[in-house]
Amino acid sequence: MIVVTGMPGAGKDEFVKVARSLGFIDLHMGNTVREFAKNAGIPEIDHEIGNFATSERKKYGMDIWAVRTAQKITDDGRTVIDGLRNYEELQYFSKFSENPYVVAIFASRKDRFSRILKRDRPDDIRTMEELIERDTRELSWGIGNVIALADYMIVNDDTLETFHARCRKLLTEKFSISNKI
């Protein structure tokens, strides 16, 4: 099992796309949050969904989003989970895999802001101030700790093609995955 972490807009989804092309099954913790938020009638606005995620963590524990996402795991050996936000979530995923590997994706705030604006998801931020607010919220959840403890770090500071190549190299060399899958 590979669990991916990184600040918003760092490139986690792109890492997952490469992993999927190599035969991994992908799960997205953010999709789980958005699904539960929608069912609770929460508007598709970044700070509303973020507040909902925080509220659920306070009610049910810091690992609640891991608990809810893990229900969808079908093959722990070939699963990539996108969106690790804290150590408690990592501990929970350890129940499904003896040694889940943490891959952290890093990109500058400037690059992340530009990418977020381009992807144009309905619940995304629209201003630098909103990104700073979101970064602060995610840091309060403990994301900095899991980034610091990552087994592998990929820097996303170049073209998309270069980043994909870095992802493919890590997956094929460290996880013995064939480039031909």
Swiss-Prot record:
It comes from the Archaea. ATP binds at residues 6-13. The keyword ATP-binding applies. Transmembrane segments: none annotated. Keywords: ATP-binding, Nucleotide-binding. GO terms for molecular function: ATP binding. The keyword Nucleotide-binding applies. It holds the Pfam family AAA_17. Belongs to the UPF0200 family. HAMAP family: UPF0200 (MF_01111). This is UPF0200 protein Ta0179.
